[in-house]
Amino acid sequence: DIVLTQSPASLAVSLGQRATISCKASQSVDYDGDSYMNWYQQKPGQPPKLLIYTASNLESGIPARFSGSGSGTDFTLNIHPVEEEDAATYYCQQSNEDPWTFGSGTKLEIK
């Protein structure tokens, strides 16, 4: 299985500043020109919400302050400017190889 290592495990960011979350895959998640890395946001008591698919594509209805980048094994989620409603846990997920796997999560606190 592909192991996804997220960092940091938690971070606290001031309102209006930038939050950066990294995800490193144990092997490439690229295939045929695309990177099959996705990012989700989860708030307590709610199902995960898809933010970014294939590394850099913004899901419909998601604010443009969320952006994703990377390829191969190294990926980044940026949130800028951070808003209070962004307090949540964020997960990377690869969909290149079965079984699809998730990172262990990054908890974002807004200061």
Curated annotation (Swiss-Prot):
Region feature Complementarity-determining-2, mapped onto this chain: 54-60
Highest taxon listed in the record's lineage: Eukaryota
Keyword flag Flavoprotein: no
Pfam families tied to this protein: V-set (PF07686)
Gene Ontology CC, one term: immunoglobulin complex
Keyword Disulfide bond appears in the UniProt entry: yes
Chain spans, region Complementarity-determining-1: 24-38
SUPFAM superfamilies (alphabetical): Immunoglobulin
Region of interest (Framework-4), residue spans: 102-111
Region annotation Framework-1: where it falls in the sequence: 1-23
GO biological process: adaptive immune response; immune response
Region named Complementarity-determining-3: 93-101
Region (Framework-3): 61-92
Intrachain disulfide bonds: 23-92
Annotated keywords: Adaptive immunity, Disulfide bond, Immunity, Immunoglobulin
Location of the region described as Framework-2 in the Swiss-Prot/TrEMBL record: 39-53
Protein name, entry field: Ig kappa chain V-III region PC 6308
Species for this entry: Mus musculus (Mouse)
